[in-house]
Amino acid sequence: IRRQRQMCIRDRRRTVIALKNNILYDLALAPNVEVELPVGQRWSLNMEYKCPWWSNSKHGFCYQLLSGGVEARCWLGKRKNRERLTGHFLGIYAEGGVYDFQFDKDKGYRGNYYAASGLTYGYSHQLARHLVLEFSLGIGYLATEYRKYTTYEGDLIWTSSGRYHFMGPTKAKISLVWLIKGRRR
C-alpha cells in the first residue's frame, strides 16, 4: 500500500484513458480489446469488443462471436491520493452480439442476437506506473434466440429453434490494463 501511495504522489499526470486486454478471453482464443475512460475521480465508462471468428468446415468446427458492451463503474473508497481506475469498483453493464458455435460435424448453434446485462464487482491492482491487473465478475441475466442446425453434405440444415435464458455469472475478467497519462495536474 505504501508503494502505491508513493507511485501516486510521484506521478502527478492524470490517467486519461486505459487500454485493456482480458487474459481469460485470450485463453479461449477470443481476441478482445477494452477502452476505459475516467469521468472524474469516482466514475468511469468501460467499452469492450470481442471477435473470435474461427472456422474450419473440413473438420466441422466453427467458433464465431461478434460482441460489444458498455459498463458504467463507480470506484469505491477514498480517491484523493489514489491513482484513477485503481481499487475496488461496482458497475452496471449491458452487452450484446451474434454467434455461431459448431464443435463437431453433427450439430451447431447460431444466434442472430444475444443480450446480457447485470452488475459487476471488481478490483484493480497497480503493478507499475502504467500497468494494472484487474479482476472482475459480473452477475446478471442473459437471453438469446438460437437455431440448432446439422450438416448434410456440406450444407447447414436448420433442425429446430429455441430460446435460452440464464440468470447467474455472465462475465469474468482478469485483464492487463495500460494506463495512458495526460497533462500534469
Q: Which residues does each PLM region occupy?
A:
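Residues that define the transmembrane beta-barrel architecture of outer-membrane proteins
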Residues: 1, 15-17, 27-31, 62-68, ...
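Glycine- and aromatic-enriched membrane insertion/assembly motifs of diderm outer-membrane
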Residues: 18-100
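Outer-membrane beta-barrel "beta-signal"
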Residues: 69-75, 166-185
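Short loop/turn motifs that connect adjacent beta-strands in outer-membrane beta-barrel proteins
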Residues: 11-15, 42, 77-87, 126-133, ...
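Residue-level signature of outer-membrane beta-barrel architecture
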Residues: 25, 37, 74-76, 123-125, ...
